[in-house]
Amino acid sequence: MSTFASIALAAVLGAQQPAAPAYKREVPDSLIAKVRVSEDSARAIALRRVPGGTIEALELEREGGTLLYSWDIKVRGKPGITEVHVSARTGRILSVEHEAN
């Protein structure tokens, strides 16, 4: 294979890898194997609840025995963040709380 072909193949393969999220992400490997709802689906559910919001952070955690995604969402022009908990098993919104800093 020529050098040019190798470089072109590497560029195509590199382009196929997903980009890293633009937010802080704490997702322990020990918990990821237990989820039934994908991170992408849970993110879409949380963002529908906070229109115009931007994800600042995600934490996959067990809280009170429930496995959940905890999303910190910032809305431009609004102080603080909105925290949305989405069940990692059902996709149901468990709670929404605005935390004004």
Where are these regions (language model features)?
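Long, terminal "pre-/pro-" and other extracytoplasmic accessory regions
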Residues: 2-101
